[in-house]
Amino acid sequence: MSHDKKIQRGFFTYKRGGLFMSTVTEQPIVGNVHSIESFGSVDGPGVRFIVFMQGCRMRCQFCHNPDTWKINDPKAKKRTADDVLKEALNYKSYWGKKGGITVSGGEPLLQIDFLIDLFKKAKEIGVNTTLDSCGKPFTFEEPFFSKFEELMQYTDLVLFDIKQIDDQKHKELTGQSNDNILELAKYLSDINKPVWIRHVLVPFRSDYDEYLIRLDKFIKTLKNVDKVEILPYHTMGKYKWEEMGLKYPLEGIEPPTDDRIANAKKILHTEEYKGYLKR
């Protein structure tokens, strides 16, 4: 191919030595986007451009974004991967060597076609990609699994939320089983995809030594864990439940104390997972 030959992929025209805008030549994949945070610092390495997708099947009692549950919520914005990537690149100078794009939710895997489109185009121009997921949509059945395999080719890191290690307690906390969630954790280990395990610590729901010990044992079976994070429960999203006319299920439950947070970190051996410092 000559140096001047161009390849059109949607919004961008790629040419050796540069990136140029072009007219759309194919029908773009459209995603339902809840919101965007242009300068995130806790959802992946470095400074992140965070895309919050619409839609989630779980009904976590501690959810601080219940307005993301309905995938076709009329308030959601219709965005293409090219559109989102163009906006993200406005902030590229802040990312440094480790920053990039994180897609969260809601549950982004419910819109896996959009994810593939966005992450593929991001990787073609050298942008770091992180997926923040609870894993509930995961299945080995087709066509999802083939799509997920492709998505992983363009994903640098997975932020993986394990809400509760006990299946019955997980159902009580989220309304869903964790069977396929744990299967996804094992699969990500099998393909050696870097993950950060995240666990929301909720008094009287997930903050029990018995379940933390079981979670610790499970994490130790995985070979790809670069970091383990404790996310203390908070009530900042309570007002959204009230605005939506929903009863807040954790009424009267306060955030965990510093002692309980320290206890959870000790049981999960969070200080032993330092792989993220080497990447």
Predicted region positions:
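Short glycine-enriched, charge-decorated loop/helix-capping segments at active-site entrances
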Residues: 67-75, 171-177, 245-254
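Conserved AdoMet/S-adenosylmethionine-binding subsite of the radical SAM
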Residues: 89-93, 97-100, 105, 109-236, ...
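Auxiliary Fe-S-binding modules of radical SAM enzymes
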Residues: 9-42, 196, 201-279
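N-terminal [4Fe-4S]-dependent radical SAM core
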Residues: 7-77, 90-97
